[in-house]
């Protein structure tokens, strides 16, 4: 018990607290200095950054300037002011929705939720179906089939998304085939937001299904044979045996897969980068990456605020499942 608590404090509690503290600060304002630049045609004065003074400020206060919770409510995050102004100035709901979807945080929120709510159930169902199918195969072909099935999970997300990105390109095998089928040389899966979202969701299902398959396949080996044999004697067909014997036995496993898949899908990032879909699809992880990819000015405060809001959203999404699981655990004791 003690080692577990120590590990949770070191690897979970302390990092979250440090991120929260960082979210309360923003970068120092760069001090300026007047510089005189001379050339053969004369001298002129320009305004530049006082590098030495800026370095001294960062050394004195490495966290930056204290900003409190203002970062959480600025335009790049919860944007309460912009939402209020958009609601007040909009005559129709469609006008307000345009304002809503133009805000970075809510744009990322909608895509992240859509991606998670579509990919998670499809992954569970597809993984379960694949596990049932492979479990009935003969031993000679079962091994190679399992290896081929888990290949999408072996491939790193970034490489897998890049390969699919090249395949759906207009000159790729999938992109050119779709153009031939619809007789439209200008049709592209990367041309619209909806098609981009569908492509990303399809890739997510393809990449994460092997994980669900492996867990379900391992759990199928633990299904007791006595209830199945009794069901066969009673005349139950295959579907009835799966419905009344297998599924109840695998329900806790399905809950486990749902929890892991939801947490994994919420932090979707590599497919967006691999598909170059930043203009059409943004996630919380991409917002954090966007804040930190500028080497000269890294917005640590903004990235930390997005991280805390992501943690809160994960907690909200997982709370119903955790409560239900806890109640069932208490009833079974």
Show where each model-derived region lies.
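A structural signal for multi-pass alpha-helical bundles of membrane permease subunits
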Residues: 1-333
């Amino acid at each position: 018990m003690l080692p577990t608590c120590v590990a949770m404090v070191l690897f979970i509690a302390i990092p979250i607290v440090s991120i929260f503290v960082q979210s309360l600060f923003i970068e120092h304002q760069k001090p300026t200095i007047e510089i005189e630049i001379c050339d053969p045609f004369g001298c002129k004065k320009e305004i530049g950054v006082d590098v030495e003074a800026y370095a001294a400020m960062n050394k004195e206060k490495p966290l930056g300037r204290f900003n409190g919770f203002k970062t959480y409510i600025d335009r790049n995050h919860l944007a309460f002011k912009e939402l209020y102004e958009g609601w007040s100035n909009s005559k129709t709901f469609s006008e307000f929705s345009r304002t809503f979807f133009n805000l970075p945080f809510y744009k990322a929120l909608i895509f992240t939720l859509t991606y998670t709510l579509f990919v998670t159930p499809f992954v569970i169902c597809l993984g379960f179906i694949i596990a049932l199918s492979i479990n009935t195969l003969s031993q000679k072909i079962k091994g190679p089939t399992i290896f081929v099935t888990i290949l999408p999970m072996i491939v790193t997300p970034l490489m897998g998304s890049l390969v699919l990105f090249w395949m759906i390109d207009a000159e790729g095998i999938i992109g050119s085939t779709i153009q031939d089928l619809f007789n439209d040389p200008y049709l592209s899966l990367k041309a619209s937001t909806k098609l981009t979202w569908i492509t990303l969701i399809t890739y997510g299902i393809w990449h994460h299904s092997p994980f669900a398959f492996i867990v379900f396949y391992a759990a199928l080996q633990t299904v007791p044979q006595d209830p199945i044999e009794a069901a066969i004697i009673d005349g139950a067909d295959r579907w009835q045996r799966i419905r009344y014997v297998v599924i109840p036995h695998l329900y806790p496993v399905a809950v486990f897969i749902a929890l892991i898949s939801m947490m994994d899908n919420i932090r979707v990032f590599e497919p967006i980068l691999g598909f170059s879909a930043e203009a059409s699809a943004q996630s919380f992880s991409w917002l954090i990456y966007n804040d930190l990819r500028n080497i000269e000015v890294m917005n640590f405060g903004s990235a930390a605020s997005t991280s805390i809001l992501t943690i809160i959203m994960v907690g909200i999404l997982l709370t119903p499942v955790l409560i239900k699981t806890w109640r069932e655990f208490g009833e079974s004791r």
